[in-house]
Amino acid sequence: WGASLRTAAWACAHRVDSYRFTADREALKKSLPILESNARFIMSWFEDDGEGRYLSGPGVSPETGFYAPDGTGPNVLSYVSNGASHDQLLGRESLRNYIYACGELGVQTPTLLKAVQFLRKIPQPAIGPDGRVQEWKQTFEEMQKGHRHISHLYGLFPGTEWDILNTPEYAEAVRKSADFRRKYADMGNNGIRTGWSTAWLINLYAALGDGNAAEDRMYTMLRHYINSNLFDIHPPFQIDGNFGFSSGVAECLIQSRIMQDGFQVILLAPALADGWKKGSATGLRTRGGLKVDLSWQNGRVQATATATRPGKFRFMHQGRKKDLSMNKGAPARREFPP
């Protein structure tokens, strides 16, 4: 972690995501100096690679390494490189979030103008020859095939760079990457032996719409990484595993991470496991300011959504969609199939 300088960027992302739920302009206004400082740091750290692209470096993919040739041999264990996918994703997100915040607040600054230009030159992570998201700019072999850190998949969750609707090619690459990690972790390849990492996989599979895989990781977590008092273990207690598990369950029931055609997309019951034939949840909150009560039974989904502020929403379930413009306090009831 000593060479991972994007932790502040991750913290800044929470400030902007909170605004997407609450629309608290005063909180966003207070956060703007922090978001601007982070954006300026990103632009000072990333450097031109000689081909007009900006890469972060030196940096790491947290806590894991790769085998690469150097002057001493063909396969030397290394950690530091330029353009690690985790850094690239957080750099892009930092600038996008700063630009978004300025737009919401009606602010124009020299930093904003520079960020707009700079963002265009930060490349996405590559998809490797095997179809997985590359963890580093080059196609290196990872140190541990089942490693607990899956930082290069940040773009799907908790980030919003990728999703199943707008970037299906990256969603599929994330699926292959997650399946690869899960396979080798289950084989005992120095793998995912922590609750928080298992919880991250739950959320990734939920974002991919794979309820069965998400449920599989839930049971793995309950069997191996939850104490009798329900504390998540690393083996020491780590509350991010508990929060991550709860988040994963919620993401299986409702998601609001995607924008499409100017609509806030609300995915209803996007990742129900086959065994979840019947159920309900109340008081679910979404980006865009909805409060949703949800129930499902044998493939039919019913939702009642109440807006806390005006907005445009696209309700979706299994490919079907309904667009609505909603006013504050006005409940809307939707059922799929209609």
Briefly describe each language-model feature range:
Residues 1-33, 84-261:
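Active-site core of glycosidic bond-cleaving carbohydrate-active enzymes
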Residues 2, 46-48, 82, 146-148, ...:
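A general structural signal for short secondary-structure junctions and capping/turn motifs
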Residues 10, 55-57, 291-295:
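Structured core elements
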Residues 37-101:
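Acidic/histidine-rich catalytic neighborhood
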Residues 59-60, 115-120, 269-276:
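A glycine-rich phosphate-binding loop feature that marks nucleotide/adenosyl-phosphate handling sites
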Residues 65-81, 182-192, 257-277:
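Intrinsically disordered, low-complexity coil segments
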Residues 212-338:
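Non-catalytic C-terminal accessory modules of carbohydrate-active enzymes
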